[in-house]
Amino acid sequence: MQRVDLNSDLGESFGAYTIGQDDRVLEHVTSANIACGYHAGDHNVMARTVKLAADKGMGIGAHPGFPDLLGFGRRNIQTDHKDIYNFIVYQVAALNGFCQLHRVRMQHVKPHGALYNMAAKDRVIAEAIAEAIYDIDPSLILFGLSGSELIKAGKKLGLTVANEVFADRTYQPDGTLTPRSEANALIKESERATEQVIQMVKESKVIAVDGSHIPIEADTICVHGDSPTALSFIERLHAQLQVEGVTVTKVSDFLFK
């Protein structure tokens, strides 16, 4: 039977500000990417979100980003290999501390926002991220855009990698995501988003914005939980995957070295 993971970016509240609906999203996904304080989140939110995810048996992952609270980690920042390596270590280790407190093992690491997108194309950035993860714990699973430089960098080091696809994002002919600055970046119709996911999972391809068919691997599907219709969409997607004979489960249940 075919298996796939559903992941969502969580723990993005900080201080007096509440972002997202983490408690409810955790009812429907199998892996949680938890912000580590640089682009969103803080120490209290990290502690709470790890506990919530641990109590529900989720696969728990660190979601490190650029040090950019004002831009929510979505602004490209030019820096060097060592800086990227160090801020990945800093954030991943911080979240791992909360995992240790709750006696759960961290499952994965997924970079956030601009860092994720830059690592998809830039080999130097991708290698800095992969090296940091490997040096912290080589058993961690690296989430990256399917077929990207980040996936290649992880494989090169011997990390277990999870090819990630997106339910609500459109794709460029080169397999990258359409930038959020473009009008057609997001898929807002739940039926269309569901169809795209089923095609990626069952047929290993996706239709790009120019109509071309791109081969794609789908180990984990990113669903966003911060819109008014997010929960109903995630429920529908989960149900449709089951109808198609796909088991939804965390990646550590089926990806091994």
Curated annotation (Swiss-Prot):
Keyword entries, A-Z: ATP-binding, Hydrolase, Nucleotide-binding
Gene3D superfamilies reported in the protein's UniProt record: Glycoside hydrolase/deacetylase
Gene behind the chain: pxpA
Species per Swiss-Prot/TrEMBL record: Halalkalibacterium halodurans (strain ATCC BAA-125 / DSM 18197 / FERM 7344 / JCM 9153 / C-125)
Quaternary structure (record): Forms a complex composed of PxpA, PxpB and PxpC.
Catalytic activity: 5-oxo-L-proline + ATP + 2 H2O = L-glutamate + ADP + phosphate + H(+)
Membership in a protein family: Belongs to the LamB/PxpA family.
Classification via InterPro entries: Glyco_hydro/deAcase_b/a-brl (IPR011330), LamB/YcsF/PxpA-like (IPR005501)
Domain of life: Bacteria
Protein known as: 5-oxoprolinase subunit A
Gene Ontology molecular function: any one: ATP binding
Keyword Ligase included in the entry's annotation: no
SUPFAM superfamilies documented for this protein: Glycoside hydrolase/deacetylase (SSF88713)
EC number: 3.5.2.9
A biological process term (GO) from this entry: carbohydrate metabolic process
Function field: Catalyzes the cleavage of 5-oxoproline to form L-glutamate coupled to the hydrolysis of ATP to ADP and inorganic phosphate.
